[in-house]
UniProtKB/Swiss-Prot annotation:
<feature type="transmembrane region" description="Helical">
    <location>
        <begin position="225"/>
        <end position="245"/>
    </location>
</feature>
<dbReference type="GO" id="GO:0005886">
    <property type="term" value="C:plasma membrane"/>
</dbReference>
<feature type="transmembrane region" description="Helical">
    <location>
        <begin position="366"/>
        <end position="386"/>
    </location>
</feature>
<dbReference type="GO" id="GO:0009103">
    <property type="term" value="P:lipopolysaccharide biosynthetic process"/>
</dbReference>
<feature type="transmembrane region" description="Helical">
    <location>
        <begin position="194"/>
        <end position="214"/>
    </location>
</feature>
<keyword id="KW-0472">Membrane</keyword>
<feature type="transmembrane region" description="Helical">
    <location>
        <begin position="275"/>
        <end position="295"/>
    </location>
</feature>
<keyword id="KW-0808">Transferase</keyword>
<comment type="pathway">
    <text>Lipopolysaccharide metabolism; 4-amino-4-deoxy-beta-L-arabinose-lipid A biosynthesis.</text>
</comment>
<feature type="transmembrane region" description="Helical">
    <location>
        <begin position="334"/>
        <end position="354"/>
    </location>
</feature>
<protein>
    <recommendedName>
        <fullName>Undecaprenyl phosphate-alpha-4-amino-4-deoxy-L-arabinose arabinosyl transferase 1</fullName>
        <ecNumber>2.4.2.43</ecNumber>
    </recommendedName>
</protein>
<dbReference type="GO" id="GO:0006493">
    <property type="term" value="P:protein O-linked glycosylation"/>
</dbReference>
<feature type="transmembrane region" description="Helical">
    <location>
        <begin position="129"/>
        <end position="149"/>
    </location>
</feature>
<dbReference type="InterPro" id="IPR022839">
    <property type="entry name" value="ArnT_tfrase"/>
</dbReference>
<keyword id="KW-0441">Lipid A biosynthesis</keyword>
<feature type="transmembrane region" description="Helical">
    <location>
        <begin position="98"/>
        <end position="120"/>
    </location>
</feature>
<dbReference type="GO" id="GO:0010041">
    <property type="term" value="P:response to iron(III) ion"/>
</dbReference>
Amino acid sequence: MTSENNPLRHTALFPSTTAVERWAIPGLILAFVMFYLLPLMSHGLWIPDETRYGQISQEMLLSGNWVAPHFMGIRYFEKPIAGYWMIAIGQAIFGDNLFGVRIASALSTGVSVWLTYLLARRLWNNPRINAASALLYMSFGLIAGQAGYANLDPQFTLWVNLSMVAVWFAIDNRTPRARLGGWALLGVACGMGLMTKGFLALLLPVLIALPYMLWQRRFGELVRYGLVAVVVCALVSLPWVLAVHYREPDFWRFFFWHEHIRRFAAGDDAQHARPWWFYLPLLFASTLPWALLLPSTLLRMWREKREAKMAYLALWFLLPLAFFSLSSGKLPTYIMPCLLPVALLMGQTVVKWLDQRSGRFLRLNGVFNTVLASVALVALLYLQATKEIYENTEMFSLSLAYIVVVGWIIANALQVLRPLTLWAMPALGIGLLVALLPAAMPAQIVNSKMPDQFIAEHQRELSETASLLSNDLGAASALAWRLKRPQVDLFNTIGELKYGLEDPAMEARKVTMDGVGQWMTEARKKGAVGVVLRVNSTQEEQEVELLPVDGKHYRRGNLHIFIFAQKQP
């Protein structure tokens, strides 16, 4: 009898299989609501990602153009359409607010947690492993942190996860009908992944399934049933693929070469260029607060690699990680699709330790996390005493920061004291962190990284203006989102809108330092003018000096808001 099927009951976290089956799913749902959903409205939109994706999706609702993405009315072809659809649907249902912008990321992560639970049940049919794997995945630092952040990575990760779960269900089923269902589901996931972030959604399932099926000597089955996935993927994605080509013939050329070829093969000139080993230390950080369990988990994976399900999980983890490491362009969130198999492997490892009543590695994990948080607490006390990073008016935010750090220490200390009965307590620590830390940010970070909060305080005055101007894409998109007005002209900045601004029709949207005086004169003839500037450099200070001196001026940190009244000729 294997240890995972051992009927031995002991006073671990899961006192009985029946209790796990009864409480695991309600407990995961409760944690999802408390740590993922409730904090969504507790802090402003981070720049540049959240304001960008919130504005692009809102613009779909305002313009009715659900085919070609536009950023503040300017062509923006760096991503396909489906991710914007989901964020737009969130805003359509819940309103143009923080919850509406972020709900797509939270729900995508929640579904990925559910997929973890389902696949664990399929692999081992052990309620304790099911619950442990889902809890671990839900509490990985990178996964939990992105769940409340409005970008496309949680959505893309969902579609990759669904693809790989569908492949396993397809190849593990005995009946042709069930296999067809699995391959068809793979096609749906690939089609949605393609429309969320591109051709990587098609590559990753092939990268994993092909060597696995060759190893299993089932290549013919892969070819026969794989055609079903190809057809379904085409049915899902082809209508939009053709529609965007018809409306914007240059979309696929730009998207393919800029977002795929350049990122993978451009070397040091690639966007977000990083060394090949970038993801190795990041993998450790991404799995906090469970990072010290990672070596033992991977060692067990290697020892059991000849077992079919372990080999599949190993390929799912290792091959995408190797592919992303070879790519020239790298961002931390790219490895999110690698983490679900890690959670499954780690969940099985933890339950085996509990069955064997071996808490050594769990205790070491708690010690590491406790020391880490203790260092963070000392650093916070020192910085507050010497630098006063929180002002006297920010005691509530400072209190939240202390709650986060002390809560992390207590949660992990409990794991140290009772590693078998309270092994899951680090999940509570990471839950407190992702729920409270964004709201605990000092004002200097809020003012710098969440400009929509300051803009919201002056929203009435800004909404009464006829023209808008900004020197920063993050501030401009926050302004456009808050006012529901995509038309924000760009003062001495281009950034990621370089491609869209090359359109001759967009020439009027670019305002140079030499031309801002004339632009202001013409704009004030039409009505009041609102200007939002971020001032971090000497050049940006010069931009402020070029503005008229007769306007209202509001300042918070490096963010400046000017309101200029209409001026008749």
